Regions:
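Ferredoxin-like iron-sulfur electron-transfer modules
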Residues: 1-10, 30-38, 180-184
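Short, solvent-exposed segments of well-ordered alpha helices
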Residues: 1-4, 33, 89-99, 124, ...
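Ferredoxin-type iron-sulfur electron-transfer modules and their immediate structural context
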Residues: 2-17, 159-167
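Local cysteine-cluster metal-coordination motifs and their immediate loop/turn environment
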Residues: 7-24, 37-68, 96-106, 110-113
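Short, flexible helix-adjacent loops and helix caps
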Residues: 22, 26, 117, 142-145, ...
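Surface-exposed helical/coil interface segments that assemble multiprotein signaling complexes
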Residues: 55-88
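Charged, amphipathic alpha-helical linkers/stalks
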Residues: 75-135
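Extended, small-residue-rich solenoid/repeat segments and analogous flexible loops
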Residues: 136-184
Length: 184
């Protein structure tokens, strides 16, 4: 997978994060929004009506949210099905669920790709094992979106956690690398 596939491209996305995710009123979000409910600022053309003013409106969390490229991948997948925007709500629940799974896959890919830069395959079995897990996650990300519902993320999270700790050990300490580990 290319690094650019793991970077959000909001212009190529149907604002799936503005529907699929939930948030609670806090310093990052001015109001509560349950998962599966369209954000009150989402327009019919899948754009944020207040994007240029998020911080002032009490929504800095929206500005820093990172889907790791999962949003545009899901948008492409559903566009192929003939559902090109959020206006077609027939498959909202499955699209939202698939997006949330794919986002975790993309985040794990990003973490392991970054770790691989620190510990390349030439540094023994850590690099080779990283490459194998990256390939496994890449295959999940590239599979048809409906296959995501059959993915057990637990073993992949565990593998990522172990690999990131091993990279930390190989680099002389775990502290910096542990901050990358997905614990959920």
């Amino acid at each position: 997978m290319r690094r650019s596939d793991l970077v959000p491209d909001c212009g190529s996305c149907a604002a799936i994060c503005c529907v699929a995710t939930s948030f609670e009123a806090s310093e990052d979000f001015a109001f509560d929004k349950p998962a599966g409910v369209h954000c009150r600022h989402l327009t019919r053309d899948c754009r944020c009506a207040v994007h240029d003013d998020l911080a002032r409106r009490g929504l800095p969390g929206c500005a820093v949210y990172d889907c790791y490229g999962a949003g545009q991948r899901m948008t492409r997948a559903f566009s192929v099905r003939g559902q090109s925007s959020l206006a077609d709500t027939a498959n909202d629940a499955e699209r939202n669920e698939a997006f949330l799974i794919l986002r975790v896959v993309h985040e794990l890919l990003w973490q392991l790709t970054e770790a691989a830069k620190l510990c390349p395959a030439t540094r023994g079995d850590v690099g080779a094992t990283l490459a194998l897990e990256i390939d496994a996650l890449d295959a999940i990300a590239r599979a048809p979106w409906s296959d995501l519902f059959d993915v057990d993320l637990g073993p992949h999270r565990d593998a990522a956690r172990r690999l990131l700790c091993r990279v930390g050990d190989a680099l002389g300490g775990r502290r910096a690398v542990r901050s990358l580990v997905v614990l959920d």
